[in-house]
Regions:
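A glycine-rich, hydrophobic/aromatic-adjacent loop/helix-cap motif
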Residues: 463-532
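Acidic/polar loop patches that form or flank catalytic/metal-binding clefts of enzymes
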Residues: 201-207, 240-242, 305, 331, ...
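Glycine-rich phosphate/diphosphate-binding loops that line cofactor/substrate pockets in enzymes
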Residues: 290-303, 353-360, 450-464, 527-537
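Short alpha-helices
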Residues: 396-397, 403-436, 477, 590, ...
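A generic structural motif
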Residues: 329-341, 391-398, 490-512, 566-575
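N-terminal export/assembly segments and adjacent metallocofactor-ligating motifs
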Residues: 1-16, 21-24, 36, 51-55, ...
Length: 778
């Protein structure tokens, strides 16, 4: 550690720390505009000047590293004059529009002007005015206010990786613009409004809506993806104004999906009253009438239950209590993206924190579009790549990352066994073995050279394996994950403290779901097939919309019209056309509850907002159904319900009373031993379905802000490599029959792969493993 003196007080900091950061860490206030802890140092504003004993002139503290014994002073008469001079320069062209600026009342420029600025300006020349440009749906501009700190430019280059913003001209003509109109393409673009210190870049959806002192701030957890980011919900009354990252949270950024989904809270798609279908219409009724009708449809029937994993821990546990009490033989499913429901050798969830993934020697991404699936984690990997650390990627498509992975390999999904077997061959030659490896690779005849890339990465001292949706949704996923488990154990990456086995889950609470539902779960595809074959009499949907999400929209549409359906949730979605009863459940912003993210971090959230209608927390809806079905209500308050959580998932026992951060480990199943199955008859093309940040999930589709952004990222119906299929209309043959699709061409798709880019259009083939096509070459 390095010892220095700040305002005569001795402090210690890590060597290499800047003076400004040392002052921030120890409570010594130094004004600054251009510095940001997550961005490179620019030293543009010169507001952070400090005096260092023995130095002839003040130093910019943001770019000056500490030294042993250094004596720093942050306040003096000379520094005050310097800061007054810099404020005068910065304010020369800045408009006096604080009363109408969204930043007014929460603006560093205002605060520092009061503290360091003059009461009257001396500049008498013509002030500069800058033309504003439309940057996209999320950011509003007033660039006349810009002080050229370049935070936005550095963010676009270093964090987003898009380079959308740039500096033009110099001197008094200097200006910051987007490269073209409507140019922002990053999944983190909303962060530009957060990092701008002066109100030049503003949040467009909340522009001119409220003043900072009118807003109430509530800490909560975003449930829009497995990352489960810490967020602050800003509201006026019970209306959400904006969502921002929690400053004390793990990640400094949140994605645009988590930031702008809030307009769905008051969407017309919200279920706010109980309803019963009468003819073609769903009509509002009382809770008693709706519950009574649900009991008529469900009691004594063979029931299927399909739910979303994004509910709170308490809500999900209540679903299991309802099943145990009233529907003991029910078929239960919750994963719309998984075909193989056998136990995995390592269950869903991350064994590492995102910081550990950023720091390890090697990272290998297997079959995942992280930019769409987990944009905040992708930012970590982008940061890692930019610092010179390797990231390798194997999959059916070289997904856009706004950076360049160190190594890329394109493969077809049918080649995954050959890739893993090739990696096993190489690590075996290096003398690294695990019991069962010879038997596994002996079951695979083919070899694929992409396995060499995987094996090379595994030979590092530390390695993080990020297993994505291409493997999770594979028909033989259990054997593939067992093969990867063997590789990681052979190479020493499965030990406690260095476990690099990370399986990206579909949603939140993966650790809970494997404990609470692991013994009764089935695949969504099997559930719909059972319904279509007459093996079920009724269906309960809890926050799930299989017509718009997952791999089985065609199967869901065929099955749902054949049986009565009770829909419980916050968003109606496309599946509501089949609902006979709707019961409103409160949104995640309207409940007190617990959530577990993919790292196993337990987040306990209060109730930020009140319900907008007669919605109730999901667990209360479940308990009401238990009572109406004639069962004994197992819990009447959260404390009683949490005792059932602890019984079903012992790893959560006591987390609500514990102090500090709680992390739940990911399950490891030594008995999940599965060898690769023999390939069945396959079609010409392998099918891979796209996950869209702006379209996946009923919440996203109910948000006008996100659907508008999604249109800007629209692709063809399906995509193939030009060597596979020429662009244009083609007839695709599958088990569902023949259908014509508009095929687009991309060279970043593996030959022999048909990439379903628009599931709403091409849902008829999204559940297929392989298909045939007229014409084309493979």
């Amino acid at each position: 550690m390095t010892a220095l003196f700040i305002n005569d007080e001795e402090v210690t900091v890590t060597p290499g720390t800047s003076i400004l950061e040392a002052c921030r860490q120890h409570g010594a206030e130094v004004p600054y505009f251009c510095y940001h802890p997550e961005l490179s140092v620019a030293a543009n504003c010169r507001m952070c000047l400090v005096e260092v004993e023995g130095w002839p002139k003040p130093a910019a503290s943001c770019c000056t590293p500490v030294a042993e014994g250094m004596k720093v002073r942050t306040q003096s008469e000379g520094l005050e004059k310097d800061r007054q001079m810099m404020m005068e320069y910065l304010l020369i062209h800045h408009p006096l529009d604080c009363p109408v600026c969204d930043q007014g009342g929460a603006c560093k420029l205002q605060d520092y002007t009061v503290e360091h600025g003059a009461s009257q300006g001396r500049y008498t020349e013509m002030k500069r005015a800058v033309v504003d440009h439309d940057l996209g749906p999320f950011i509003s501009t007033c660039m006349t206010r810009c002080i050229h700190c370049t935070r936005c430019v550095r963010f676009a280059d270093e964090v987003a990786g898009t380079g959308d913003m740039g500096v033009l001209d110099r001197g008094d003509h200097m200006r910051i613009e987007g490269i073209v109109d409507d140019c922002l393409s990053s999944e983190l673009s909303g962060s530009l409004g957060d990092i701008c210190p002066v109100g030049a870049l503003l949040d467009k959806p909340s522009h001119d809506v409220s003043r900072p002192w009118e807003v109430t701030r509530h800490k909560s957890t975003c449930t829009q993806c497995p990352q489960g980011c810490d967020i602050t919900i800003e509201s006026r009354g019970d209306e959400v104004i904006r969502i921002r990252p929690d400053r004390e949270g793990v990640e400094p950024w949140i994605c645009d999906r988590g930031r702008y989904v809030y307009d769905a809270f008051r969407s017309d798609e919200r279920i706010v009253e109980p309803k019963i279908r009468e003819g073609d219409a769903l009509n509002s009724v009382s809770w008693d009438d709706a519950i009574g009708r649900a009991v008529e449809l469900l009691k004594g029937k063979r029931v299927g239950i399909l739910f979303s994993p994004f509910w709170s821990v308490e809500g999900l546990t209540a679903i299991r209590l309802l099943q145990d009490s009233s529907f003991k033989d029910a078929k239960v499913a919750f994963d719309l993206h998984r075909r193989d429901m056998r136990q995995f050798a390592f269950e869903e969830g991350l064994a590492m924190t995102t910081q550990q993934i950023e720091d390890v020697d090697q990272v290998v991404v297997l079959g995942s579009d992280l930019r769409q699936r987990l944009p905040v984690l992708m930012q970590r990997l982008r940061k890692r790549i930019n610092s010179g650390k390797p990231v390798s990627r194997i999959g059916a498509m070289n997904y856009r990352t706004n950076t360049h992975p160190t190594h890329d390999a394109l493969i077809r999904p049918r080649d995954w066994p050959a890739v893993i077997a090739r990696a096993m061959d190489q690590v075996t030659e290096m003398g690294k073995l695990a019991a069962g490896m010879d038997e596994w690779r002996g079951a695979v005849k083919e070899r694929h050279e992409a396995g060499k890339l995987l094996a090379d990465a595994l030979m590092a001292d530390s390695c993080a394996l990020l297993v994505g949706e291409e493997i999770r949704s594979h028909a033989d996923a259990a054997s593939l994950i067992y093969g990867l488990d063997l590789l990681m154990r052979a190479c020493g990456h499965a030990e406690e403290g260095s476990d690099g086995r990370n399986l990206i889950p579909e949603g939140m609470n993966a650790q809970l779901l494997s404990s609470v539902f692991g013994d009764i779960r089935t695949s969504a595809g099997e559930l719909f097939n059972a319904a279509a074959n007459g093996e079920l009499d009724a269906m309960i949907l809890v926050g799930s919309d299989p017509l718009g999400d997952g791999l089985f929209p065609a199967e869901a549409k065929q099955a749902m019209g054949k049986l009565p359906t009770v829909q419980i949730g916050a968003i109606a979605g496309e599946i509501s056309q089949f609902a006979d009863v709707q019961l409103p459940a409160a949104a995640y912003s309207e409940v007190e509850g617990s959530f577990i993210n993919m790292e196993g971090r337990v987040r306990i959230a209060g109730q930020p907002l009140s319900s907008i209608g007669s919605e109730r927390p999901l667990w209360k809806v479940m308990m009401r159904l238990v009572q109406a079905m004639g069962g004994e209500v197992p819990a009447i308050n959260l404390d009683e319900l949490r005792s059932h959580v602890a019984r079903l998932a012992p790893q959560l026992d006591g987390v609500w009373d514990a102090e500090g951060e709680i992390v739940i480990g990911t399950a490891r199943n030594k008995g999940a031993v599965f060898l690769p199955s023999k390939a069945k008859k396959q079609g010409k093309l392998d099918v891979v379905s796209r996950y869209s940040l702006y379209r996946e999930g009923a919440w996203a589709r109910a948000s006008e802000l996100l659907t508008d952004a999604g249109r800007r990222h629209a692709l063809d119906d399906v995509i193939a490599h030009p060597d596979t299929l020429a662009a244009g209309e083609h007839t695709i043959r599958s088990s569902a029959g023949e259908k014509k699709f508009n095929v687009g061409n991309r060279t970043n798709v593996a030959p022999g792969v048909l990439f379903v880019a628009k599931r709403g259009v091409a849902g008829d083939i999204s559940s297929e493993l392989t298909v045939d096509v007229d014409g084309g070459a493979v």
